Amino acid sequence: YIVTDVLYQTANKLKQFIQAGQAEEKYLQDFFKVLSQDQLEQLGWTGNQQDTNDQILMRPTIISAALYGHNQVAIRQAHDLFAEYHDHLVDLPADTRGAIIKNELQHYLSAEVFHELLNTYRTTTDPSFKVALRGALTSITDADLIQHLIGEFENAETIKPQDLRGWFQGLLANEFAHQYAWDWI
């Protein structure tokens, strides 16, 4: 696990040098796809009783890498899991829940799903689920939905003042949203 984890940490550092939409991004995504494909096939999406501790720890890293690499099989599997758990997303495995929800917003985005997830964030009391939802919601690329999300910054019923920093930071990290976030200030 340690070697694999360091490998993916190093590969993830390369994202800092890539701009969205550039040719280099496609090369990096292809690298992630190749790097994760066999491991994802071996590990699968859900754990079982025979999993070693290393397999349990590696699964979320491998799934995130496969999704970043635009592995079409992984994208469809994440979508299928989202659809299966749609009415009870909190029951998705906590270690992969954020990646599954983020995948849905990145590849199957609709305003309806966005608003459902934002409302789920508003009503849930599970802090780890809130973190997963925030991470996914701040990764959206649609300008209108980004502006709607920023409009919620001042609505304490949705985003509590103590949580605002995490939302702002998430949008700053999103190349499609960081200018909107700066403009809000």
For each predicted feature, which ranges?
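Long, ordered, helix-rich scaffold segments
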Residues: Y1-I185
